[in-house]
Design a protein with these regions (language model features):
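Extracellular/periplasmic carbohydrate-active domains that bind, remodel
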Residues: 1-132
Length: 132
């Protein structure tokens, strides 16, 4: 998948197996600050704790042979967007997550007053053969 030169706005991008996300020179991939653009919640880790949350701007889970290449730029949301003002939970994730709950029930998606952990830039989780 090629992102050509120019500025492109996006919510979460999920890479599947055998995909190379290439940003051409002059491409700027800017991610939105809208919490809804990172739904539904996906399996991720926050400070090593498994939860269902926003994941990452560029996300993959159990994918093989994936790549993020090129000379373009990946940008997080601007500072003035809602996501950056959203309550981010306690300073210690263990205070937000009940370890007795199955991971699928550990929702940190920002919905209905739940905690929201901001997405990481790139998170290949449980993936094999990753090239950056």
């Amino acid at each position: 998948m090629v992102i050509p030169a120019g500025t492109w706005r996006s919510g979460r991008i999920t890479l599947k197996s055998n995909i190379n996300l290439r940003l051409d020179k002059g491409a700027v991939l800017e991610f939105t600050g809208d919490v809804d653009d990172y739904q539904p919640a996906v399996f991720t880790r926050h400070e090593g704790v498994e939860v269902m949350g926003a994941g990452a701007f560029i996300y993959a889970n159990k994918a093989k042979n994936i790549a993020l290449t090129g000379e373009g730029v990946v940008m997080g949301p601007p500072m003035d967007v809602a996501m950056r003002k959203f309550p981010n939970g306690n300073s210690v994730v263990e205070k937000d997550v009940d370890y007795r709950m199955p991971v699928k029930q550990r929702l940190c998606d920002g919905k209905e007053g739940r905690t929201f952990y901001r997405p990481k830039s790139f998170a290949p989780i449980n993936c094999k053969n990753v090239l950056v």
